[in-house]
Amino acid sequence: MELKPPTRAELEEVRLWRNEILETLRTPYPLTEEMQVNFYDKVVCNPDSHHRYFSLHAGLSTFIGLGGLTNIEWENGLAEISLILSPQYRGSGYGRQAVSALIAKGFNDMGLSTIYGECYQCNPAIEFWQKITIEHGGYITMIPRRKLWQGQLYDAMHFTMWRQ
């Protein structure tokens, strides 16, 4: 799995994938093309941003998704992990490779000590994140009634992994 700087065209693909899975997101509103371009210019391309995003490539050139280490607290060595894959690559093992690459980037290259995340019970990827967290010796906490989606409340799973 190769991590590369994302391009504006790749982020447009990601926007379309993201808008198909709103129930899984902390901010469940669709993004417009203009919003995504603004995000690319002000966050992704900003070296002073507290967010680092990476285009995920399988092999030499196949773009499969976007990963991030976001909400970075440099002084505390903390970052939140994020991941979105093209629908055609979900469930294929690429997610596991992407998370391993992001964790290595965070711990080995960026000097982070803790990587955390959140996944809602209404997200089919919750089992994926449970397995990944356990494999990396992490800790899981369930937060009841954390996410409101279409009139129903869902629990959230918070997970934390530490540099070994």
Please place each PLM-identified region on the residue numbering.
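Acyl-donor (CoA/ACP) binding surface of acyl/acetyltransferases
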Residues: M1-N19, Y53, A58-Q164
